[in-house]
Amino acid sequence: MFIGIVSLFPEMFRAITDYGVTGRAVKNGLLSVQCWSPRDFTYDRHRTVDDRPYGGGPGMLMMVQPLREAIHAAKAAAGEGAKVIYLSPQGRKLDQTGVCELAANPKMILVCGRYEGVDERVIQTEIDEEWSIGDYVLSGGELPAMTLIDSVARFIPGVLGHQASAEEDSFADGLLDCPHYTRPEVLEGMEVPPVLLSGNHAEIRRWRLKQSLGRTWLRRPELLESLALTDEQAVLLAEFQREHQTKQQDYEGNV
């Protein structure tokens, strides 16, 4: 997969190229990340990349010419078919479904805004899609771009040690992940659930699914509203809800 980055701070992306899962993907040739700075496409001695907005108002906008030339350079390096994405609060909110869609693109270019944003005409002429990572304000598009790269890279074949890791992540099937445990078996009186030690893979799968459903119901109930539960899932969720209610009653009775 090729990912081009247009950013005033390309050095920030060493966090992606040098470390962790994405760093290994780059090292192993599974992911190529290249950066272009609009500042390298300026022609004045101050290397100016921002200007005042027409109509007044606070802040500055990224200038059209350096930004467009940086995007064009990234497009030329990517070749035909590269999707150009602007990280923007006005964009479609990134979720696991969106990540899967983006992961199907072998080439993409991520444009990171700064200041108060970019000239609307750049969006109209150069941008294919706008994406957001949430309804809050950041100083620029670099962190959203890194979030997108990290999430998409997990779907590149060979990046993860076990492809099932991506398939079993939270949100992969519309649910939150189940609890996980490792050694020691007992920690300060808290024991690993016996079913996980049983070796009964069918029961372990059932327990994990029930916990995943229950955790989603407790923490993100709106996710369940968009899911058509299977008969097994409906039964397991009802079991979890009954068990949770019993625990709550026992707790309140002991207070």
From Swiss-Prot:
GO terms for molecular function: tRNA (guanine(37)-N1)-methyltransferase activity. It is an enzyme of class 2 (transferase). It is found in: Cytoplasm. Its EC number is 2.1.1.228. Gene3D superfamilies: 3.40.1280.10, tRNA(m1g37)methyltransferase, domain 2. One of its GO terms (biological process) is tRNA N1-guanine methylation. Its main location: cytoplasm. It comes from the Bacteria. InterPro entries: Alpha/beta_knot_MTases, tRNA_m1G_MeTrfase_C_sf, tRNA_m1G_MeTrfase_TrmD, tRNA_m1G_MTases_N, tRNA_MeTrfase_TRMD/TRM10. Transmembrane segments: none annotated. It catalyses: guanosine(37) in tRNA + S-adenosyl-L-methionine = N(1)-methylguanosine(37) in tRNA + S-adenosyl-L-homocysteine + H(+). One of its GO terms (cellular component) is cytosol. Keywords: Cytoplasm, Methyltransferase, S-adenosyl-L-methionine, Transferase, tRNA processing. S-adenosyl-L-methionine binds at G113, I133, G134, D135, Y136, V137, L138. Belongs to the RNA methyltransferase TrmD family. Specifically methylates guanosine-37 in various tRNAs. This is tRNA (guanine-N(1)-)-methyltransferase. It comes from Serratia proteamaculans (strain 568). The lineage of its organism: Bacteria, Pseudomonadati, Pseudomonadota, Gammaproteobacteria, Enterobacterales.
